[in-house]
Amino acid sequence: MGIEKPLVIFSDLDGTLLEFETYSWHEAAEALGLLVRRRIPLVLCTSKTRSEVEEFRAAFRNCDPFIVENGGAVYVPVRDWNRAVPGGVRIGEYWQIPLGKPYDVLLSAVAEIRKQTGLGLRGFADLEARQVAELTGLSLERARRAKEREFDEPLIVHGNEEQDLLAAWARKLGLRVSRGGRFWHLHGGADKGRAVKRVVSLYDQELGSVTTVGIGDSANDLPMLEAVDVPVLVQKPDGTYDDRVDLDCMPE
C-alpha cells in the first residue's frame, strides 16, 4: 500500500466556514478543532482583508498561510517558514506574496472610470466604517477591519448596464471585476486559483507532494475549486447552490 500524501485544506469564509448573515463560525467549530488536533493545514482563502482574517485565525487557533482579497496576496507566517519565501516580501510577522495590483492603483482606476462613464460608483474607500457596517451587517470594529484594503476594492453597482460598463472599462485599464456575495470587486487580475497554486507549491517543497481539498460556496470560489484535487461546493442554507455556478461544469 502506498503512503498517503499529506492533506492541505483551502476554505472560503463567508457562507462556508462563516454563516452568511451572522458571520458565526460555531457550526464549524467541531471540524476546526479536529483540524487543529490532527495538524492538518487549513488555508483560509477569502475576499476579506488581512486584518479581518487575523481575527478569525486567532479564533480558530489557525497558524497556517492564508489568502486575502480574492487572491490579491498570500501571507505566510515567518515563524513556520523561517527562510525566505520565493517572491515574498517580509512584512512584520509574515512573508507577503503580492499577486494583485496595489490599492492606490485600483482607486485611481475607479476615479478614471467615474470620469469616463459618469457612473456613480461607490466603493469602501468612499464609505465610513458605519456605512460599511450597515451594508454588511458587520460590527463597527469588523467594518473598520474590512476597510483596511490592499489589493481589492468592493464596489456598489446597480443593474446589468452598470455592471457591463464597469467590466468593460476595467478591462481597458488592465483590471478585472468579479461578483462576490454582496459587492462587485475591482482587482488586478489575481484570483483565488492562482493564489492556491502558490501555496500548494510551498507545501510541496515542505512536505513533498500534497493532496488538496477546496471548500467554497459561490462562483467567486470556482478558481480555487479548479486548482485543488478535491473540490467541495457548499449548499446555501435553503439547500440550493449558487445559481451562477454550472454544476455540470464543476471540476470532479
For each predicted feature, which ranges?
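A short, Lys/Arg-enriched amphipathic alpha-helix followed by its capping loop at the start of a domain
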Residues: 3-11, 27-40, 202, 210
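Asp-based phosphoryl-transfer active-site loop
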Residues: 5-22, 225
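Hydrophobic "anchor" residues on beta-strands that sit immediately upstream
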Residues: 8, 65, 213
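Active-site phosphate-binding/coordination module
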Residues: 25-123
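Phosphate- and divalent-cation-binding pockets in alpha/beta enzyme and binding domains
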Residues: 27, 52-55, 131, 165, ...
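Acidic, Mg2+-coordinating phosphoryl-transfer loop and its flanking beta/alpha structural elements
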Residues: 46, 196, 211-251
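Short, structured coil segments at secondary-structure junctions
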Residues: 59-62, 69-70, 173, 227-229, ...
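Conserved acidic, metal-coordinating active-site core of Asp-based
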Residues: 109, 113-213, 219-220, 227
